């Protein structure tokens, strides 16, 4: 074609576009929307794929940041080099091999073995990319390339369309027997994640065609960046952590294949993450973040500290990369900041992510509350570059405060990227970034039946884990969390300066039928049915006072109780009534404490107990004393119940609560404090005082009084003039405040605190109805008082704040 003809063709094409007609390759003319063409034409930019690859490697590996004089980096390098060398040495290389590594032999029948194998290849590739490695020899490069090629030809890339058909039949139970070891997650997320990482790491060892060839099967198993379960014929919208994971896989696939449309779609899918779950959501639509900061996964399990952490880490990996693409994220930073402030931070104390938010992950020995918290802090540092200056400073202060709050572990041990270690070192050495003061914070997660409380003055945190018709008692799938029976039955957590209490083998060695705050039959239920009750939740007044209630029934529906918890600044009141069992062979037991005995002396009514005191006796107080006052724990019993104290040594194995964990014995000694109930003793009331000296604890023995302890109506009062209660009944209930009658006209939790001689500050919440400021008059009444200053507490807490004014 001559230059003149080319010019004519170009001019003609422009003319055709301007008139709304376009010529296709076969010469056909078709009418089109010329405005749409103009928009698409001006907006399309070619991504810099090399820059995107570099950004991904910088964020997740940080080779350029490696400093061999940094001991944490050197330690990390040596460990990775050693592991990769062993994997290379152990790799099967014979021509008749049917697997690459022992421990992952069943590549056709167990999908986790496929993912494990790809992860092993990824680990080798990660080490070989380091400038100081001795592993990047001609022989080893050939070895890893052959391993990648073998897995493509014999496993993941072997007729993927047929594999999807087989997986779909298996999922529907059309195979005999059904193979439960084939998991969609491995085909759509686990293996593709390891594979795409590996291909980017091996960029200098593979041609572009080889990389595209090896990544090609991903689009068969996971064709969409916002869908999961495609590999098993049940494609559905991805939510929460799964949406981040699948969009991340497709983002990396698009970079490898240099597919601009896939790149844009993956970013569009990622942007869908930044939404809140709707109140009307059902089934899997309930997965994700709620406006009160709750995070749900698997439809009904609180999972901020596990899947929520995975989501946050995924966001921190993707946002720096998206920033370098032509398609900027449209997500509102305010949404992400809200998740961090309301969802994550109230659950973290002294560098520890509270176990009440970690689901079945508590049964994994090496996936601790500290590793979860460390991942959050790492993610905050990564996200810094995408935030405004004030948010950057605030996040840095949060991270520095968290890392410095616990010297029992090294944060850098939990950082895999050299760039993360470099960022952390820079932050810790930055004298312009100060630590935050201790926080006074009270957070009620009514959408996931959890409560957290941080007391600034006494430096402790308290947690509460409940269950309702909306929230599971616990999760025990994939052979994990096998003894989580009662972890959602009103279990209370006390976090203090004894930072290792829950972290060091607690879940492997504690008596899981005797968890603090719970009322049980000391049983090991064989079923995991939900609590059918919906009256579970709480309300708060500022960040010091709260009233929480749970209408409780056990798994077998043989035990019921009304269980209330009242947070009153420096103390927490536990009050229960209506404890009834239809199982005549078992008496209900309320567990007051189950604490590791190491470092403590226990005093019962001021007498030290050195062995088990199995004879239940009327008891006024129990006090656990440590050399550190902040670790002290005291209990006052208001109705002189018969209390049993045991000091026992427990031996357990992580494999007993998680089939995939180690079988070696772990041993700990515990103090167990319990109250046994019967038909004539169907209630309890005790007050927890953390962090006090023994003399201060004794002086508090009359600080709380019971106003009402009826079967369905609880009210307590403290010496600061705070009244807190729960009405479990649909009937009107009343009580007196200094001769003034207060009427509760419907079910609900409430807190009332005297403001001055003419007014009371109040809060109210009913988990079974919509709580609005407009109808609060129909819920509470004091003759001669008018309700004023009505407001919903805030957008993140259910409940109504108001004042009663004379």
Where are these regions (language model features)?
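C-terminal beta-strand-rich structural cap/linker in extracellular carbohydrate-active enzymes
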Residues: 447, 682-687, 791-806
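Alpha-helix boundary/N-cap detector
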Residues: 43-47, 51, 68-82, 112-115, ...
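Aromatic-lined, polymer-binding surfaces characteristic
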Residues: 91-365
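N-terminal functional module detector in eukaryotic proteins
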Residues: 54, 166, 576-578
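Surface-exposed loop/edge segments in extracytoplasmic proteins
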Residues: 786-789
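Extended polysaccharide-engagement surfaces of secreted carbohydrate-active enzymes
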Residues: 318-331, 336-773, 777, 781-784
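Low-complexity, Ser/Thr/Pro/Gly-enriched N-terminal "stalk/linker" regions
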Residues: 40-114
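Gram-positive Sec-dependent secretion signals
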Residues: 1-40
């Amino acid at each position: 074609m001559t230059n003149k003809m080319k010019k004519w063709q170009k001019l003609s094409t422009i003319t055709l576009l301007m008139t709304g007609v376009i010529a296709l390759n076969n010469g056909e003319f078709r009418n089109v929307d010329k405005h749409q063409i103009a928009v698409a034409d001006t907006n399309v930019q070619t991504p810099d794929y090399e820059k995107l690859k570099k950004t991904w490697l910088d964020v997740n590996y940080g080779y350029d940041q490696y400093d061999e004089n940094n001991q944490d980096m050197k330690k990390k390098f040596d460990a990775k080099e050693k592991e990769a060398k062993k994997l290379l040495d152990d790799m099967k290389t014979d021509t008749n091999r049917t697997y690459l590594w022992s421990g992952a032999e069943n590549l056709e029948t167990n999908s986790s073995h496929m993912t494990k194998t790809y992860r092993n290849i990824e680990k080798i590739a990660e080490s070989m990319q380091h400038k100081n490695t001795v592993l990047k020899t001609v022989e080893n490069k050939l070895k890893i390339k052959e391993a990648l090629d073998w897995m493509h030809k014999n496993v993941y890339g072997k007729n993927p369309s047929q594999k999807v058909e087989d997986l779909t039949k298996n999922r529907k139970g059309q195979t005999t027997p059904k193979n439960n070891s084939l998991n969609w997650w491995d085909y759509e997320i686990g293996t593709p994640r390891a594979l795409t990482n590996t291909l980017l790491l091996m960029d200098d060892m593979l041609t572009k065609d080889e990389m595209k060839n090896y990544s090609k099967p991903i689009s068969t198993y996971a064709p969409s960046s916002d869908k999961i379960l495609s590999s098993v014929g049940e494609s559905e919208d991805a939510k929460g952590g799964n949406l981040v994971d699948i969009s991340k896989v497709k983002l990396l696939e698009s970079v490898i294949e240099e597919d601009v449309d896939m790149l844009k779609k993956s970013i569009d899918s990622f942007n869908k993450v930044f939404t809140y779950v709707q109140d009307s959501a059902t089934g899997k639509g309930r997965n994700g973040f709620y406006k009160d900061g709750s995070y749900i996964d698997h439809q009904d399990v609180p999972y901020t500290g596990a899947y929520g952490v995975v989501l946050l880490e995924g966001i921190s990996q993707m946002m720096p990369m998206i920033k370098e693409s032509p398609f900027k994220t449209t997500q509102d930073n305010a949404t992400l900041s809200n998740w961090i402030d309301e969802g994550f931070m109230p659950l973290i104390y002294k560098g520890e992510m509270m176990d009440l938010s970690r689901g079945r992950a508590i049964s994994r020995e090496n996936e601790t509350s500290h590793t979860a918290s460390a991942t959050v802090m790492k993610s905050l540092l990564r996200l810094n570059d995408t935030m405004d200056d004030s948010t950057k400073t605030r996040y840095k202060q949060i991270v520095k405060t968290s890392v410095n709050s616990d010297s029992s572990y090294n944060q850098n041990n939990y950082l895999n990227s050299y760039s993360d270690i470099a960022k952390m070192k820079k932050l810790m050495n930055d004298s312009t970034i100060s630590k935050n003061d201790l926080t006074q914070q009270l957070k009620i997660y009514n959408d996931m039946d959890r409560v957290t409380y941080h007391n600034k003055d006494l430096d402790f945190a308290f947690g509460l884990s409940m269950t309702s018709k909306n929230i599971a008692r616990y999760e025990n799938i994939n052979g994990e969390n096998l003894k989580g029976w009662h972890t959602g039955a009103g279990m209370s957590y006390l976090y203090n300066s004894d930072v290792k209490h829950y972290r060091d083998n607690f879940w492997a060695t504690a008596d899981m039928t005797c968890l603090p705050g719970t009322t049980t039959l000391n049983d090991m239920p064989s079923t995991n049915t939900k609590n059918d009750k919906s009256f579970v939740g709480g309300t708060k007044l500022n960040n010091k006072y709260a009233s929480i209630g749970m209408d409780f029934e056990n798994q077998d529906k043989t035990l019921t109780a009304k269980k209330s918890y009242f947070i009153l600044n420096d103390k927490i009141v536990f009050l229960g009534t209506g404890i009834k069992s239809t199982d005549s062979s078992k008496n209900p037991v309320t567990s007051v404490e189950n604490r590791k005995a190491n470092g403590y002396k226990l005093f019962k009514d001021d007498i030290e107990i050195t062995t088990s005191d199995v004879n239940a006796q009327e008891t006024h107080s129990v006090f656990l004393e440590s050399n550190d006052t902040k670790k002290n724990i005291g209990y006052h019993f208001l109705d002189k119940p018969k209390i049993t104290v045991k000091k026992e040594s427990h031996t357990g194995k992580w494999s007993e609560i998680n089939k995939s964990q180690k079988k070696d014995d772990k041993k700990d000694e515990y103090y167990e404090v319990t109250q046994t109930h019967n038909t004539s003793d169907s209630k309890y009331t005790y007050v927890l005082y953390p962090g006090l000296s023994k003399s201060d604890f004794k002086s508090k023995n009359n600080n709380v009084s019971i106003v009402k302890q009826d079967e369905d109506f609880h009210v307590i009062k403290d010496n600061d003039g705070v009244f807190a209660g729960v009405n479990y009944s649909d009937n009107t209930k009343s009580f007196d405040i200094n001769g003034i009658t207060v009427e509760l006209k419907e079910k609900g939790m409430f807190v009332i605190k005297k403001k001055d001689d003419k007014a009371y500050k109040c809060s109210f919440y009913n988990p079974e109805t919509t709580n609005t400021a407009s109808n609060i008059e129909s819920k509470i009444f004091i003759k001669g008082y008018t309700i004023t200053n009505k407001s919903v507490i805030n957008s993140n807490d259910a409940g109504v704040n108001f004042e009663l004014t004379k």
